[in-house]
Every structure is written in structure tokens, then in C-alpha cells.
Amino acid sequence: MSENTNIFINRELSWLKFNSRVLEQCKKDIPLLEKLKFLAIYCTNLDEFYMIRVAGLKQLFTAGIVVSGNDEMTPLDQLREIRAYLQNEKNELENEYFKIKNELANKGLFIKNYNELDEELSAKADEFFFTQIMPIIIPIAVDSTRPFPHLNNLSFALAVKLREENNPESVHFGMIRISRVLPRFVKVANDTYVPISSIVGRHAEEIFPGYKLISSAAFRVTRNADIVIEEEEADDFMIILEEGLKLRRRGAFVRLQVQKDADPEILEFLNAHLKIFYKDVYEYSIPITLDGLWEITSNKDFINLAYPPYAPKTLPPFDENVSIFSTMDKENILIYHPYESFDPVEKLIKEAAKDPKVISIRMTLYRVEKNSPIVQALIDAANDGKQVTAMVELKARFDEENNLHWAKALEQAGAHVIYGITGFKVHAKITQIIKKDAGKLKFYMHLGTGNYNGSSAKIYTDVSFFTTDEMFEKDTTNFFHILSGYNKNRKLDKLSMSPMQIKERLLEMIMMETEYGEEGRIVAKMNALVDSDMVKALCKASAAGVKIDLIVRGICCLRPGIKGVSENIRVISIVGKYLEHARIFYFKHNNPGFYISSADWMPRNLERRLELMTPIYDENLQNKLKEILKLQIKDNNLAFELKNSGSYEKVEVPDGCEKINNHEYLENYYNKLYKNIQKHRDDHISMIATKLLKES
């Protein structure tokens, strides 16, 4: 195969390859319920891709924009490639679903259609229908006086073709809308689930009395869900955002998912009203709401079909019986979630809320959980009279409503709530707490790569950095002043902030390694690499002989393996039990060489968001980051390597070498570390860690 010499890979096609790697997990030797989770994740990812990315390409095409980007693909080129790719991959999705369904049946867990149920389970399905479904579904007739209804984004329904009992020649069309509050897979026994559309279809004639069902087809619509808000024209951003959320429900239709082998007249009926381009219609022989598979994966009777549970560990120097402030007074601390517990982060905020010496708490909130103990602690602190400043990013996509709720609750408690800076999203993860003791101010700071969300911290890999170092006091204060006030000098000292500094600083460090040529070394771990300036700089470094390892979970627009250009760049993507979310950067000849950040290397992060990049100076903490990166580079079980063609190949275990699954390795490492600590409570953590590393 000839070498592709364009250094840029199309962003959308790269994303499709990432989602294919998610689907690929279903083929691996992992527990069956975990495979169901990956099916659900794949479908949820695809929903968002169509709602945002495909919808955006359609808008560009409709507007007549034909200019291509660095990858030389026009909007129409991309739409054609996306549709062809997904129509082909649909077959693979169906095959994996049926394969997993059969394997589950062999283990005694069943997914059955209504007509496959025995008499006892049919009766239970009927009871569920009449008591739980019938009262809240909406039967809709469509005729000259009752127009086709409005369908919200991701609405799920059953289209029906009916005839009157006393008039066999009559044909009527309608639908049965299935509420979001209803399960997509109904549990009729501990070991049996039924797609809800199968139950509703069986009872269509009870829903339309006096009519006979000729045929039915489950379907689901996807709308353009991108919200465009003119912030500069908004007097009250909260009101404008609430209006924008309503408009999301009315965006243009961009996709139709429908049951395979549907009655042609039903398809014609839907097409006449939805007017979705035929290549954006996907016909499925499997349930079209696989996001509902999460309902099955939580079945505790089949816990043996899931991964063994792992409990994140709280390790020294943290101690549940010791104040977190006194712990932070002694040293800087870096922990790696989810192997290490998120509890110290929550404990920091809770202690601050209760400590009478704390006078100020400032933090950024991007994606928080619905019942957030962190936000509740902030509310308690504000109610107690402490100065609380919360930057609540209302523009966090698909978390807007939850963030609106918390913003209002914080305001009612008396906190100063900031909604962001006009034209920018605030994506930085930072907390600053100030204590006043004996007339002196003491700063306690937390900087991280992940959200302040205890739920996601159990499944996302992220880094948390706790510090009282004076070098960060002024920077953290200035950052929050930038958020709350007027400040044109948006530059920090030790910390770097986008949009003014991070990209510039990264390019400087890449250039420094470039000057060292073959002695240079770069390792960068992130979620996505899209920014063209970063791609060009990395290729220039590679051409100079710098060895570069990129660990990019999702989109990567850099094409490796071009002779004389990017041949010294290796790109891997790790997909497994945990979602890789940490951003860690290493530059051999920089001082310090290690950084953590909230920012991916994308134009939106580097140019249109407020992000932070934090230098790590402590040698022991640098060593911890180094070990994380080394382990990921060596992974030969979860890693996929990006090839020059733009395709990804699974990294295989070399002959004579051991399998390295970095998720399993770290679980085992931290389990063993924790057990040893429990046995030797008086030993210092570094001594135990050294001993364990030697043993391993």
C-alpha cells in the first residue's frame, strides 16, 4: 500500500474510528455485561455525533460552503464518507448484538420479544403494560384535523397502520409515543427483559379501540441539538440559555432510525412528514434504543457477568481520621483516579465548608452530578456566611439543565455565581480555599484534569493535584479575578491559561525538543489532537529526530509514519474498562518536564475556552506521572495503534512477552498497596511503594 503523505486526517472520520474501537470491545474476551455497556456507549456516542457534528456539516452544505480544511475534504465529501461508513458498520453492530444476546442466553439471561414469552411471562408483560405503560403513553392519530405531531430530539415511538373493524377498506396512520421515563427494556423476570416496543406493539389494538393493527414499526428521530446563543446580546444569560434548551427540541431532523422490514407505506408516511434524506435513514433488525441496555447491566443477580468490583483507594498521606488541611500543610500530593479515591477532593470541600477559619471558597463547576455533595457543601458554606464563588459553566453541552439547577440553588444560598466569560467556555478544573489563622492567610488549592463529579471519577482516569505552594497563590487568585471581573491582562505566571498561554507554551516546549533533535523526547496523553498548529509542530519535531509518543484516546488528526515527516511519531489509543480522560504532558528538556491540564490539543480548548495547565515540580510526583505514561505506552492489551492509512490496529502481545493491560495492572497494584498499608500502618507510603515495585 502506498504511503499517504497528507499529515492531516479528517476529524470526523477519525472520530468514527474511535467509536469503532468502542464497538471493537464487544469482540474481546471481557464479561458479557461489559460488552452490553460498550454497545450502549457506542450508540450514545453516535447519537451525539449526529446531533452535533453531522448536523453541523449539513448546515455547512446547505449554506453552500465548499471550502475544504487541511484534510482537503468538503462538507459534502465528509457527509458521504460518514453515511457510507455508518451504514456498513450498522451490520457489525447488529451482528455483535445478536452474538452477545445468544451468549447471555447461554448464561441464563434473556432478551426476548413479546411473542417469544411463555404464558407466565406474557401475563407479567401484559400487567406491566396496563399498569405502567398505558397510563402515560400518547396515542396519536394523524389525519386532516390532527396534524403530524412535534417530535422532540431522540423521541421514540411506534408508527402504526390501522384499519377500522367495520370498514376493512379504510387505512389510517398514527403513532404511539413512548415516554422517556419508561424503560427501553422491561424486566418481566429476574432473568428476562423485553424491548418495550415489542410490548407496546402487541397491545396497539387496545390503544386504538375499534381498529385492527395492520402493521407497526418502531422509530426514533434525531435533531440538530447544537445551541447557538448570542451572548453579547443577552441581558440575562440564564434566561437566554433556557430558551436555547427549548429550541434544541425543535432543531432540524438529521437522522431517522427505524425497524427493519417496516411496511413500505409506514416508511412513506414517516418520510412524507419528517423529510429526512434517505441516506440518513438507518433500518435496524435489533432494538433501536440500545442506550437502554444500561438497565440490564445493573442486574445484581448476574454480577458474575460483569467486571469484579474495584473500590478506589484512599492512601497515605491522606487519612480519613486526619484533617485534609493538616495533610496538605505537609506536602504536595498527586493522585490518580479512579484507582485512588475521589473522596479526598470531596472531603476538601466539605471540611472547608465547616471550618470556621475558612473565609473563602472558589471553584469551577463544569459537569457535576445530580446529587452533588460538593455543590451541597458550597451551599452549606454560603448559608454559613462564608464567601463562596462558583463558576458554573452553563454551556457544558447536555449538562446545561443540571448546571442551571445548581446555579440557582447556589445563588439562593448567597454564593456569588459566575456563568462564564462572553464568547468562552470555562473548562478549567480548579479550587482555591483561603483560611485565616492568627491574622495570616493560608491558601489550599486543587487543580485537576477531570470534573468535580464523584460518579464519573469512578470510571474516568484523571489526575488530582493538591497543593499549598505559595508559587500558585497569586495565579489562582488572578484566575478567579479574571472570571469575576474585568481583566484584559489574561496571563498567569506558573500556571498557563488558554486562550492566551497554553498553546503558546506548548509550541515553545515542542520547539525546544526540536532543537535537541534525536536527544529530544515528547510524550503527550490527551483525549483529542486536532489543532493544526500543534500537528505541524509535532511533525517538525519528528523530522528533526525527536522521538514522540502520543496517547490519544479519541480524535487524532495527525497522520504518523510519513517518511521524513512523522516517522518518529507513534500514536496509540487506549480503550477499556475505564475512560481515559487525563491530560499529561512530558517534555524532556523543559524545566519542569511534566504538566497536567484540563485542555486537549484542539482549537476549541486552546483558543475558545478558559483552560489551565499546571506544572508539576516535585520529583516524586513527576516520577508518578512518568510511571503512568510508561505503563500506557507499554500496554499491549487495550491499546490500538494509528497507522499511516488512518486505520487503527490492535497492539498485539509480542512473542515471549507478558500481557500488559494497564487498567488491570493498576487495579492490582493499588489493591496490593492498600493491603500492605493496612498491615503496616506505621510504614511510610514510599517505602511500601518501593518494595512493591521491586516485587513486581
UniProtKB/Swiss-Prot annotation:
Q: Which cofactor does it need?
A: Mg(2+)
The residues the record assigns to binding ATP are 45, 460, 553, 581
- Provide the residue positions that the database annotates as binding Mg(2+): 367, 397
Q: Which residues form the active site?
A: 427
Could you state what the record's PTM comment says about this protein? An intermediate of this reaction is the autophosphorylated ppk in which a phosphate is covalently linked to a histidine residue through a N-P bond.
Which keywords does this Swiss-Prot/TrEMBL entry list? ATP-binding, Kinase, Magnesium, Metal-binding, Nucleotide-binding, Phosphoprotein, Transferase
Show the disulfide pairing. Answer: none
GO MF entries: ATP binding; metal ion binding; polyphosphate kinase activity
Under which EC number(s) is this enzyme classified? Answer: 2.7.4.1
GO biological-process terms attached to the record:
polyphosphate biosynthetic process
Q: Which Gene3D superfamilies match?
A: Endonuclease Chain A (3.30.870.10), Polyphosphate kinase middle domain (3.30.1840.10), Polyphosphate kinase N-terminal domain (1.20.58.310)
Q: Which reaction does it catalyse?
A: [phosphate](n) + ATP = [phosphate](n+1) + ADP
Q: Which GO terms describe its cellular component?
A: polyphosphate kinase complex
Instruction: Please give the Pfam families that the UniProt record associates with this protein.
Output: PP_kinase (PF02503), PP_kinase_C (PF13090), PP_kinase_C_1 (PF17941), PP_kinase_N (PF13089)
The question of whether Transferase is a record keyword is answered with yes
* Similarity field: Belongs to the polyphosphate kinase 1 (PPK1) family.
The role this protein plays is: Catalyzes the reversible transfer of the terminal phosphate of ATP to form a long-chain polyphosphate (polyP).
| Protein name in UniProt | Polyphosphate kinase
Q: Which organism is it from?
A: Campylobacter hominis (strain ATCC BAA-381 / DSM 21671 / CCUG 45161 / LMG 19568 / NCTC 13146 / CH001A)
**Gene for this protein?**
ppk
